[in-house]
Swiss-Prot record:
Signal found in the keyword field: yes
Name of protein: U8-theraphotoxin-Hhn1f
Signal peptide: 1-21
Cellular component aspect of the GO annotation: extracellular region
Gene3D superfamilies to which the protein is assigned, alphabetical: Lipase, subunit A (2.10.80.10)
Disulfide bonds, paired cysteine numbers: 23-35, 29-44, 34-67, 54-75, 69-81
Pfam families reported in the protein's UniProt record: Prokineticin
Amino acid sequence: MKVVLLVCLVWMMAMMELVSCECWSQADCSDGHCCAGSSFSKNCRPYGGDGEQCEPRNKYEAYSTGCPCEENLMCSVINRCQSA
């Protein structure tokens, strides 16, 4: 019984963490983050650092697999951040 309660508690904490990072648009995210994900599950994610996954910036600020790169980095053709 204690194990079941513990599992439920951990599950609830995980769900609360997921919901707290949820976003609908770029305005929902803090500086240094973008709103990225599928239509039903978008989360605020940090901009890509050197060698990390990225998506090129676009005028709609719509990103599905990753954020644009941090300043002074560019998103390469293989969707990895690299020095500009």
